[in-house]
Amino acid sequence: MAAISPLFLLFLIPIIPLSLLAILALIVRPRPIKIPIKSRHAFITGGSSGIGLALAHRAASEGARVSILARSGSKLEEAKKSIQLATGVEVATFSADVRDYDAVSKAIDESGPIDVLIVNQGVFTAKELVKHSPEDVKFTIDVNLVGSFNVIKAALPAMKARKDRGPASISLVSSQAGQVGVYGYAAYSASKFGLQGLAQALQQEVISDDIHVTLIFPPDTNTPGFEEEQKSRPEVTAIIAASSGSMETEEVAKKAMDGIKAGNFTVSCNFEGFLLSLATTGMSPQRSFWLAFLEVITAGPIRLIALFFQWDWYKAIEKWSKTKTK
């Protein structure tokens, strides 16, 4: 049997990854797209505070016509003034509960045709499932998941009917707790994991209408809601969550808006989030053949890293549990 020439091996080594890149460039779907923001209508739910308000500021500063929806009329008025003061842009405000489909539909109809829809509302309480009342669980899922269905369903007919307006976008703000379950977040994680299935199925349904879905995964973010939640979250939840650090709302909003404009299906906001997205990409669509290449070649090592994270978390839970039983 003839020996394999070292020169042939040197030739073969780059051919394999280049061939894989060529294949991925042919098969990645949906195809790359750019979503313009300037002079377009951005409608943001949960827009009166936190990430939603930061996104509204950014959209307005980039020349969008901005509408924000939230429950509190007084907070909406404060948000409107802060955006106008910072950007000079007049913002439309709508007071409605996302659990009320009729109220949401009325607000969206009044706001006019939407080009960039950002579904951002969210509620969370960190405590063990056994300590949640059925009403707590229902409220979390109704706002975070059912509310997202309500907003998208209300906006979709007019978005699909758009003619000659360029590519549109529907973005859902999830959480890193929507990629991996975290102690104390059983109800919250369930509500955010549901957005993954919604986004994947929705992208298939609206791609022929030139509508592009983005799923955003922020880490802990320094919002008023997060500050309140930290006061009551279990100690072990804080230990696990610390592995991904925290970010400011403006940082998250920039990452999110950049991802929306790039038409990315998945948007991670920090390095730990990027690793988490690689670990949990599964059947998610991917527009970039370079990122698809990275997902393929790092699948094994990333799984090993994920197992080390799980080991560390379970050790923390074990240690914390022992202190509670003493």
Curated annotation (Swiss-Prot):
CDD domains in UniProt: KDSR-like_SDR_c
GO cellular component terms given for this protein: endoplasmic reticulum membrane
Annotated positions binding NADPH: 46, 48-50, 71, 75, 97
A UniProt-annotated Pfam family: adh_short
Annotated transmembrane regions: 8-28, 265-285, 289-309
A GO BP annotation: 3-keto-sphinganine metabolic process
Pathway(s) per entry: Lipid metabolism; sphingolipid metabolism
Positions on the Lumenal side per record topology: 1-7, 286-288
Keyword terms, alphabetized: Endoplasmic reticulum, Lipid metabolism, Membrane, NADP, Nucleotide-binding, Oxidoreductase, Sphingolipid metabolism, Transmembrane, Transmembrane helix
Membrane topology of this protein: Multi-pass membrane protein
UniProt KW Plastid keyword: no
Catalytic activities: sphinganine + NADP(+) = 3-oxosphinganine + NADPH + H(+)
Span(s) of short sequence motif GXSXG: 46-50
Active-site residues (renumbered): 174, 188, 192
First-level EC class: oxidoreductase
Cytoplasmic side: 29-264, 310-326
Subcellular location, record wording: Endoplasmic reticulum membrane
This enzyme's EC code(s): 1.1.1.102
Protein name: 3-dehydrosphinganine reductase TSC10A
